[in-house]
Curated annotation (Swiss-Prot):
GO terms for cellular component: nucleus. Residues 155-167 have a biased composition (Polar residues). The keyword Ligase does not apply. Sequence-specific transcription factor which is part of a developmental regulatory system that provides cells with specific positional identities on the anterior-posterior axis. One of its GO terms (molecular function) is DNA-binding transcription factor activity. It comes from the Eukaryota. SUPFAM superfamilies: Homeodomain-like. Keywords: Developmental protein, DNA-binding, Homeobox, Nucleus, Transcription, Transcription regulation. This is Homeobox protein Hox-C9a. PANTHER family: AGAP004664-PA, HOMEOBOX PROTEIN HOX-C9. It comes from Danio rerio.
Length: 260
């Protein structure tokens, strides 16, 4: 087993030497019989015929180390440092970076803290009427009205949803009334009493004269008075009844006053 090391080394060396000899023979022999022990020529030509090329080492792109990242939760900061040797090469110019007009500092941090370059339109001043149009109130309502007035105004202003619900409710109530149900008709029935029609001064004066002559009218006389005063017989009859009741009340009050 100890002789396997030298034997294996000798076998490998012999294979390498034979391979190099076959390669040289196939390269420099233009015509000649190919021996059975020779190996096939390689398809890719060797580069020994061409002069060797040496490339100058190129300096690394980023020579300086990256700056440490400060943990800031409010602003996203990209720690990019300018490389002076990249100004001549246009491949490394970051064209997407826009010029920064100024720097913004944060007063909550120390005076020697880092200043971050921000655009002037990043933080816009809020306008007074931006957040007031969504709830239907204007800036003047908040300025001149109290909280109670605003709540009452919201409650008194009907919304389209409440109007639609109320109209639908009235329609349902009308549909529930059964014309064949006498109870429902009696509850929701309108008054059949005619509207009161007051007498004119001329009619009242003529009726008073007639009452002084006679407290009770016959049917013929009632018909004549109604025709003259442009009234119905029923109106004349009712007026005389009310006038008699009034006269009885007045006489009763007089008698009571005398007894006292």
């Amino acid at each position: 087993m100890s002789a396997t090391g030298p034997i294996s080394n000798y076998y490998v060396d012999s294979l390498i030497n034979h391979e190099s000899e076959d390669v040289l023979a196939s390269r420099f022999t233009a015509t000649g019989p190919i021996s059975s022990s020779s190996r096939p020529t390689p398809l890719v030509p060797e580069c020994a015929d061409y002069p060797s090329c040496s490339f100058a080492p190129k300096p690394p792109v980023f020579t300086t180390s990256w700056a440490p990242v400060h943990s800031q939760s409010s602003v996203v900061y990209h720690p990019y440092t300018h490389q002076p040797h990249l100004g001549t090469d246009s491949r490394y110019v970051r064209s997407w970076l826009e010029p920064i007009p100024g720097t913004v500092s944060f007063p909550g941090y120390a005076g020697n803290s880092r200043h971050y370059g921000l655009k002037p339109d990043t933080f816009q001043d809020p306008r007074a009427g931006d957040c007031l149009g969504s709830n239907g109130r204007t800036y003047t309502d908040y300025l001149y009205c109290s909280a109670v007035d605003i709540r009452e105004k919201q409650q008194n202003t009907p919304s389209p949803e409440t109007e639609s619900l109320s109209s639908g409710k009235h329609k349902d109530d009308k549909a529930e009334l059964d014309p064949n149900n006498p109870v429902a008709n009696w509850i929701h029935a309108r008054s059949t009493r005619k509207k009161r029609c007051p007498y004119t001064k001329y009619q009242t004066l003529e009726l008073e004269k007639e009452f002084l002559f006679n407290m009770y009218l016959t049917r013929d006389r009632r018909y004549e008075v109604a025709r003259v005063l442009n009234l119905t017989e029923r109106q004349v009859k009712i007026w005389f009844q009310n006038r008699r009741m009034k006269m009885k009340k007045m006489n009763k009050e007089k008698n009571d006053s005398k007894e006292q």
